[in-house]
Amino acid sequence: MQPTSRLEIPRTAIKLHALISDLRWRVQLLDSDIQDEEKRTGISNISNTAYPILARNLRIRRGNLLATITMLESQLAETDMAA
């Protein structure tokens, strides 16, 4: 395995920052879409059996993105410590 150059660490950090920022923006879009769907159907209680499937799926996707953001933030912290 080749050693990481000093220039590679900042590039990695910049890429991670950009990716995290993009994913946070997508989470905000999903939040908006979820709210729109809940308003459209008039059902916002997720435990309601009539809760919209679209909103449920969007919530799952949002959760996955949030988990990815958490993982990337830990990678970023490791990268920052290596710099």
Residues of each region from the PLM?
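Short E/K-rich amphipathic alpha-helical oligomerization segments
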Residues: Q28-I53
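Residue-level signature of transmembrane alpha-helix interfaces in integral membrane proteins
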Residues: S47-T49, A77, A82
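N-terminal acidic leader/helix
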Residues: S5-D36, T70-M71, Q75-A77
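Short, charge-rich amphipathic alpha-helices with coiled-coil/heptad character
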Residues: M1-A13, T41-N45, A82-A83
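Amphipathic alpha-helical coiled-coil segments
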Residues: R59-T79
